[in-house]
């Protein structure tokens, strides 16, 4: 937004603003490879990927390991010491090879966040998760970012089931997905209850939950102003898991612990229900190895979350007596070659499509506090937020000649820091991956006030 006292935006950054602000590509990895004449090679590579997803069925060890991720946001190009899907695949396969029961689960927000997700609407990310051997996942709010039809298509493309106890079709009154899924492991039945944040309405696009004419909502993510609709849906799912014979019940939720998400946080859900033994969370990007939260009956429930962007992978161990421990793993010295090849091929494709340099800058742009690394965007002013808003202002005034007085950009649509150096189209995609449309409105000063 244009205002006095804002942080300075460097004048050395020069580009064609019209090209940058409205660049958008829709091309699938498969179509790109087909155009390049290498479809056969890609198919052969995919066929060579070892299938380890049934390892939990053969494991005889009484202790059960659950590997978990959340808010990966398509960060597939992580370098050491950060993790990758190839590392996770190898970690899981290690347990399978030793005959130990293991499950690999995700708590949502995996198909959106960088150009590696938006360039094919999450198709390659699902391919990587399939190859890595994921056993179950829940939907985060960003799984809806490519539209309702695409969200449903992603569920079909996945080799693993999605669960959500509170996503309902208002036309039928029925859940869109199963609420709970049970797995046999280590002589126990382990149940996962899926939960999607009701904030999906506002943190995705409300129109995606409406009919084609956008006259009424046809989908709901149950929440309730006081949280009761959410708590009731979760409790019903827990009770169903018990009826089905679950020995251990784990919440697989995309809720978070940020107070701004109240009354729909994971802590509030635990406090208003009974029956969870543990809760694997997402949404707030919180690093939380193990927090004890008391449920409505006074029982301590283990709450855990890995942070975001594959900075950590969670490891939950369920002992023979049912005791649960958790730890966060931030490095890995193993890698699955086939999964790594799939990721590298797509990274190279995207980098080639978006690699043209369009600008340079001699300063760092940030959305996170440079001193602490904690999120600052959406909570205060950042120089990248100022720059994006100034870019919109410049576009309307200097390119379209539309006499814009004020430009605003929602902080949640600015997604990454940018180091000093060259800017490419990929950089722009990483900063603003949602493909938002810039709009011009005529309002009075009183309305703004």
Labelled PLM ranges:
Residues 1-2, 23:
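N-terminal secretory signal peptides that target proteins for export/translocation
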Residues 2-3, 8-10:
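N-terminal amphipathic/hydrophobic targeting modules at extreme N-termini
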Residues 9, 13, 17-18, 22-64, ...:
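Non-catalytic terminal accessory segments
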Residues 24-37, 55-333, 379, 384-394, ...:
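Acidic, metal/ion-coordinating pockets
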Residues 49, 231, 336-337:
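Polar helix-capping/helix-linker motif
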Residues 332, 338-339:
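Membrane-proximal interfacial segments on either side of biological membranes
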């Amino acid at each position: 937004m244009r205002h006095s006292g804002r942080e300075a935006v460097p004048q050395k950054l020069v580009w064609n603003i019209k090209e940058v602000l409205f660049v958008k590509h829709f091309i699938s990895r498969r179509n790109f490879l087909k155009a390049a004449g290498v479809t056969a090679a890609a198919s052969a590579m995919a066929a060579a990927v070892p299938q380890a997803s049934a390892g939990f069925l053969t494991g005889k060890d009484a202790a059960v390991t659950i590997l978990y991720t959340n808010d990966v946001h398509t960060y597939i190009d992580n370098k050491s010491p950060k993790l990758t899907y190839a590392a996770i695949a190898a970690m899981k396969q290690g347990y399978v090879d030793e005959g130990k029961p293991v499950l690999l689960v995700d708590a949502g927000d995996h198909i959106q966040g960088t150009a590696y997700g938006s360039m094919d609407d999450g198709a390659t990310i699902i391919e990587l998760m399939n190859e890595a051997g994921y056993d179950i996942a829940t939907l985060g709010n960003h799984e809806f970012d490519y539209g309702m039809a695409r969200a449903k298509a992603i569920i079909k493309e996945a080799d693993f089931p999605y669960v959500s106890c509170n996503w309902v079709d208002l036309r039928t009154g029925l859940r869109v997905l199963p609420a709970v899924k049970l797995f046999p492991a280590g002589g126990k039945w382990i149940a996962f209850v899926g939960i999607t944040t009701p904030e999906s309405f506002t943190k995705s696009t409300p129109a995606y939950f409406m009919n084609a004419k956008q006259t009424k909502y046809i989908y709901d993510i149950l929440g309730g102003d006081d949280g009761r609709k959410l708590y009731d849906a979760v409790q019903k799912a827990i009770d169903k898991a018990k009826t089905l014979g679950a020995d251990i019940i784990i919440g697989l939720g995309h809720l978070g612990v940020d107070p701004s998400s109240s009354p729909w946080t994971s802590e509030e859900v635990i406090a208003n229900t009974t029956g969870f033994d543990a809760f694997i969370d997402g949404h707030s990007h919180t690093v939380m190895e193990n927090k004890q939260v008391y449920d409505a009956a006074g029982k301590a429930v283990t709450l855990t979350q890995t942070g975001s962007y594959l900075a950590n992978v969670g490891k939950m161990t369920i002992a023979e007596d049912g005791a649960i421990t958790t730890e966060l793993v931030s490095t890995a010295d193993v890698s699955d070659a086939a999964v790594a090849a799939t990721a590298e091929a797509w990274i190279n494709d995207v980098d080639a499509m978006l690699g043209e340099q369009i600008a340079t800058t001699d300063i760092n742009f940030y959305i996170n506090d440079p001193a602490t690394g904690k999120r600052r965007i959406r909570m205060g002013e950042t120089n990248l937020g100022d720059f994006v808003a100034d870019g919109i202002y410049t576009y309307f005034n200097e390119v379209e000649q539309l006499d814009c007085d004020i430009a605003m950009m929602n902080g949640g649509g600015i997604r990454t820091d940018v180091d000093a150096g060259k800017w490419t189209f990929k950089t722009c995609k990483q900063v603003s991956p949602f493909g938002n449309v810039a709009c011009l409105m005529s309002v009075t000063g009183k309305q703004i006030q």
